[in-house]
Regions:
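A solvent-exposed interaction/effector surface
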Residues: 1-170
């Protein structure tokens, strides 16, 4: 789980209908992704750059994304995190990707959905609330978290972001 950001800011308040701990099933879906690592202070810029690279690749392949951008956090610590920045696709591109880009499957199965509104710098407050929720409900998360960007992280003003956070549970 991401640690606190350098500059704590409050997330925007949830709106009626926003999920907070809603049980869902993540569907199986094919993704085109880039693996990477980032320090926390450059997290958002690193992810935006990864999404731009993925879009350039898909544009060259004449493939349209089949859903919003996602980040799969595969490992975190106080210094930074390992991730897969991904775009879902209806089918894998005809020409296999080369270099840093790969095709695979997004995590699927039972998860809890939470909504974050506002700056990416304020995500620490959302993750703290998620941790408290899991503790209160005595639920154990798997070793990954998924962020799905309901608003386009490349083109949306930072304080207007809407991020669905999915927590796969054991």
């Amino acid at each position: 789980m991401p640690p606190p950001a350098a500059k704590p800011t409050a997330p925007s308040p949830l709106q009626p209908g926003d999920a907070f701990g809603e049980a869902i099933t993540l569907p199986e879906r094919t993704i085109v992704y880039i693996k990477g690592y980032s320090k926390w202070d450059s997290a958002f810029d690193t992810l935006v750059d990864a999404f731009k690279s993925l879009r350039e690749y898909l544009d060259k392949q004449d493939v349209k994304p089949a859903g919003p951008a996602i980040t799969i956090y595969t490992q975190t610590d106080d210094a930074g995190f390992s991730f897969q920045a991904a775009l879902p696709v209806a089918q894998a591109p005809k020409d296999p990707p080369k270099g840093d880009i790969a095709v695979g499957q997004a995590p699927s199965g039972r998860a809890l959905k939470f909504v974050h509104r506002g700056s990416y710098d304020a995500m620490d407050s959302t993750y703290e609330a998620i941790t408290n929720y899991l503790d209160d409900k005595q639920l154990e998360a798997k070793d990954l978290f998924i962020e799905e960007y309901a608003t386009d992280p490349v083109n949306t003003a930072p304080d207007k972001l809407v991020v669905n956070v999915f927590v796969p549970v054991k």
